[in-house]
């Protein structure tokens, strides 16, 4: 019952309402195997040699971390936690043969602040994975995604 009160009304209203139903961007060939991606006014480069940009799978890994981060920070703020530091260390193990998809992804959240408890962290991570993180729900179902955290209360 107490957990229900603590998470009652937790949603991403406002943030999720601004997400368009269709995203559009474009990718331009620059040279060799270097491409520039542009979406919503932002740009980044892809380069399989990792000299002028990153691999597409790198941005997939970071997209998952970004989606999780937005959910976790949004929910913790609604739970009246004060966040003073937040970082996610990410890693992914890929299949060795084509298609070289991620077999596992690991996210380690390092968070500091006030009123941040393991119970709150477990709850907000579960909400992100079960309902809100669109990147998580866009991944292959056989990818093992492990999320851990380290809390430093100040």
Language-model segments: which ranges?
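Extended beta-strand/beta-hairpin segments
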Residues: 1-62, 73-154
């Amino acid at each position: 019952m107490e957990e229900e009160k603590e998470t009652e009304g937790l949603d991403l209203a406002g943030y999720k309402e601004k997400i368009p139903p269709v995203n559009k961007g474009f990718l331009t060939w620059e040279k060799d195997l270097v491409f520039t991606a542009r979406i919503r006014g932002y740009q980044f480069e892809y380069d399989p040699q990792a000299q002028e940009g990153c691999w597409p799978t790198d941005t997939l890994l970071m997209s998952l971390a970004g989606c999780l981060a937005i959910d976790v920070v949004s929910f913790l703020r609604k739970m009246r936690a004060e966040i003073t530091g937040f970082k996610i260390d990410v890693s992914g193990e890929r299949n060795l043969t084509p298609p070289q998809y991620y077999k596992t992804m690991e996210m380690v959240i390092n968070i500091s602040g006030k009123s941040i408890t393991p119970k709150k962290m477990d709850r907000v991570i579960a909400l992100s994975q079960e309902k809100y993180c669109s990147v998580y729900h866009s991944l292959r179902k056989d990818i093992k995604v492990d999320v851990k955290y380290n809390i430093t209360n100040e």
